[in-house]
Design a protein with these regions (language model features):
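ATP-dependent adenylation/nucleotidyltransferase module used to activate substrates
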Residues: 2-216, 220, 240-242, 249
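Metal-dependent de-N-acetylase/amidase catalytic core
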Residues: 217-255
């Protein structure tokens, strides 16, 4: 006969699941890097990302000590630009020959842009960074809410016209970012494109057979496009998941909602 006995709470029991711990310090881990095999806690994930971004800044960012350098950082209130601005301030913000300005474009999307704009403002206040903004109306474009309302009429008048809001918003937003960079006489523009963004863009261009567009991808350190300030992408080798984890670890102000018109 098999003997059964009751296990009380006072008796030690073997854990059914062992939470992963950091390879470096033994604390609770937040990520396993599939590409490196490392398991890291929030603190050592931050150190890993900081090291990679610092290496990219040394490659992409050319600082002119004689006249100083103005870096314009395009932010949106989201995780990518929040991490980008935080790391740029951390890595080069103390230099006397560097001026950092952050800017955000208001697309005119009710219920989405106001809270994300506030996150951008809060982040800049926390970091002590100058903040500027512009809107589609200031650029003499329609607000995106109005653009979306008119899309059915546009498609009726022109069969070849795009009915995707992102097609219009992308063009307007790029012009807004360029206008902000020009406003502060920026020497360089920093964009928050991560590894996932870069890979997606390359694959889409390959699928469309658009090799020229792939060749024009940032960074443009040595060959600025259309006379604009060089564009740098310090986060281009950082996976989106790690950026999100770092933003949460540092409790950065960020807006989690997706654009209601995203497709």
């Amino acid at each position: 006969m098999v003997e059964l006995r009751r296990i009380t709470m006072a008796e030690p029991t073997q854990a059914l699941f062992q939470a992963p711990v950091c390879d470096v310090c033994g604390k609770d881990a937040v990520v396993e890097q599939a590409y490196s095999g490392r398991v890291l806690c929030g603190t050592h994930l931050e150190q890993s990302i900081r090291k990679k971004v610092g290496r990219e800044l040394r490659k992409q960012l050319v600082l002119d000590k004689s006249k100083g350098t103005t870096i314009f950082v395009a932010i949106s209130g989201g995780k990518d630009s929040a991490v980008l601005l935080t790391l740029i301030v951390d890595l080069v913000g103390k230099r006397r020959d560097v001026r950092i300005v952050a800017g955000c474009v208001d697309e005119g999307i009710e219920g989405y842009r106001p809270p994300s704009m506030q996150c951008a403002i809060d982040l800049c206040e926390d970091l002590g960074v100058e903040f500027i903004t512009t809107s589609y109306e200031s650029l003499e474009f329609h607000q995106m809410d109005e653009v979306v309302r008119r899309l059915p009429m546009v498609s009726e008048k022109s069969a070849g016209a795009s009915t995707m809001p992102c097609s219009y918003c992308g063009v307007f937003r790029r012009q807004g970012i360029n206008a902000l960079a020009e406003q502060v006489n920026a020497d360089v523009m920093a964009l928050g494109h991560n590894l996932d963004d870069m890979a997606q863009t390359v694959l889409m261009n390959m699928a469309n057979g658009d090799i020229d567009r792939t060749l024009r991808l940032a960074p443009h350190t040595d060959s600025p496009v259309d006379g604009l300030p060089p564009r740098i992408v310090p986060l281009r080798w950082i996976p989106e998941q790690e950026i999100h984890l770092l933003a949460m670890h540092k409790q950065l102000p960020m807006h989690h909602e997706e654009c209601p018109y995203a497709q």
